[in-house]
Amino acid sequence: MNDYTILAGRLKRGILDFSEKICEGMPRPVMKLTANMLFGMAESRSCLLSKISRALHEPISLKKSIERLSIGLENLGESEAMLENFAEMARERIDDNTIFVGDGSDLTKPYGKAFECLERVHDGSAGKQEKGYWTLEFAALTHGHKTPLPVYDRVYSVSEAGYKSQANELFKALQFLRETYGSQGIRTLDRGYDSNEVYKEFFRHGELFIVRADKQRNVICKGKTVNILQAAKRLKGKYALPFTTKSGEIKYCKVSVQTVSLPALSGRQFRLVCLHGLAEEPLMLLTNLEQGDPRLNTAVVKVYLMRWRIEEHFRFKKQEYGLENFRVRSLKSIRAMHRFACLLTGFVALLSDDRNDSVLFSKLFHISQRIYPPKKSKRNGYFAHYAIADAISFVLSKTLVGIRKLLSNPSRSAQLSLPGFA
């Protein structure tokens, strides 16, 4: 027994309990696959099946272990039930003020040739076109620590059978949120989704939204059709808003609110919220929040002045677990691998969000040995995913047995069995 045996046991039990909850109503082999994948990815910090298999320490050959996981991923596919179960787990942290941040990203495989439905995508990191897949995710920002909880994810290709458009993929995500949480929360999207069809979808279902407007859009302001950027520049800023950037710099911004409508939706009223002082051009947001709604200004702060958290969420998955380094080739397996990465990120996020009440979080954060630990005044808003993931990997790597003993059915003791009935 080493100094981490008890802590490793708690982590294993936590991963197993988490796997059982997100696999509720599913066959036991699926739950066992989930526990193995989450444990292996957490210890190895990789999405390579070879490294995951080594972390499991199974009493079979490495080749057989890789084959077993590969077959399991292929059979699992998208696994909507897992997504629904995790969304239900997050329900207790969701209310009418919750911000659902939606954004698209990419999984690039620039040198890939044998991957199914591989197409050209825009690599946001490199700023150029590469081979890969599109992703769409929604995360719910918790109130206490602004922790992003991944409640929806999907990997798709424009060349796959049944693909229609990016707008249709967005409508699928919105429908999932609608079926899970009803009209709770505020849907927020970046300017890439500034579309009349998207606004019609929101109004049709009575959902609150905040969308960053494209500067090419025209609006009807005081009875005249004008460019939205020109309309925003006329507003001087009525409300003062001090803001601390990610680097710690304090900026003093001003917020203006103006009622406008759109030429294609003239019967609907929007609030144009402009944030001055953050950049050279004002930040322009279109929302259907009412003028007197107290969430109007707070939502702006949570969504766009804290938007780096959802971007950090994407970056965390790619850097911590090497998500773009996957080797599975079928689209079903890629989706399953991405789903497991999101679920593991969700497991870390739940630990991080309970930081004030969790002894486990305190121990893991101490083990992570951050070079620049957060100050007490900034501890609540600290993005702790990297620290927790590092500590989990370190603790689990100290064990010589994977998670298989917790998954196995213990044999009956012959001591308590009658002769002939054992």
Sequence positions of predicted segments:
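Single, function-defining residue in the core of a domain
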Residues: 1-48, 65, 113, 141-422
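Short secondary-structure boundary/capping segments within folded domains
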Residues: 27, 41-44, 59-61, 89-92, ...
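Short alpha-helical "recognition helix" segments of helix-turn-helix
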Residues: 52
